[in-house]
Amino acid sequence: MTFSLSTICTHVVLCGVLLVLMSALTHAAPCLDKPGRIWVMTGCVLLAVRMLLPFEWKVTKTIYISRIYPEVTCFFNQTIQLPYLPACPLYMVLLCFVAAISTVRLAGLALTQYRYRRYLRSLPVTEAFTIVNRLGRTQKVRCVTDPHASNALAIGLFKPQIVLPALSFTEQERRLILRHELAHIASGDIALKLFVEIVSAVYWWIPFIGALSRQTNAALELRADDLVTKELDESQRLAYLSCLLKVAKCSRRTPSPFAVGLMTGKEGSLKARFRYVLEHPRTSPLFHVVALLCIVMMALSFFVVFEPYHIPDDVRAETFSPRDEGAYLVLREDGGYDLYVKEAYMGMLTSIPEEIQSLPIKNYKEEKP
């Protein structure tokens, strides 16, 4: 396992491309059925794990690039001298700068979470529930009403809470909201949301990193909608959608980045949720094929690294390629071989290396003056 400038460049390029592919995939099919949601969530988790492992392994396949890339790596590999610090490559200085910003972002997220949880502890508990999560463990969930909240949300990895806004809900709407948030808690969505937000905060410098959080949120909300509405009749589904619309009209930014809210997304996401609840459309087979290809690309990206390929001019003058015109071998009487390039004698070989076995071989008598 090695870490170098090449692994960093590979990491940035591949993760950026994969993020674009995943974003385009979910944009083309915003209303996902259960298999589609599984593909998207699997892709998001794999992509997040890929971001955490910017290394080169023993089984890594090297892909050499000879244009532009050598100049880029040469620029970032140049040694610079900062005051009071030892000389080091430019990319190491930039990495330290990026790490410092990532640390500040993580600290900011943690502080926001701590302050909001402390505020919630000051609110009276209106209801309490006991649920069984996906791991078969019993969890106690308490519910509070926040007069300043504009969105219903679930928060807390080990001590989950449901926060309700101080809006005028009917008893049926209140039950539906609670079922939605309890579905998030029982499915482990808070843990997945926490993981994705931490990765996004650390790798803020990866192009299109915001797509990772948006795709995860969309898939989690559709899954919760499915768990809540799959056993409801049409009138109850309409009541559920009316509840979503009521919250969406006054919804603002979620007070904690680690919370899973009833409303997370823009107008397009809300339309997709309405369509899913009312129609339960099926994702096209083409979506599954493309999603599978994206997953395979993510898995293969763990074992690929881009390396610059550059031969200095002074070295190039003393080397040749088997594809060069005028290169050939001459079979000697003693069984050896003479190597010629453009009629210039290069040296004698006792055997033919694999790299030049494609060169034409002439008889010694043909070349003898």
Enumerate the language-model features and the residues they cover:
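Hydrophobic transmembrane alpha-helical segments in integral membrane proteins
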Residues: 1-18
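Juxtamembrane/interface helices at transmembrane-helix boundaries
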Residues: 28-35, 83-166, 307-312
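Hydrophobic alpha-helical membrane-insertion segments
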Residues: 42-60
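Alpha-helical transmembrane signal-anchor/signal-peptide segments
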Residues: 63-69, 116-128, 215-218, 309-327
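Short pre-active-site segment immediately N-terminal to the catalytic Zn-binding motif
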Residues: 162-177
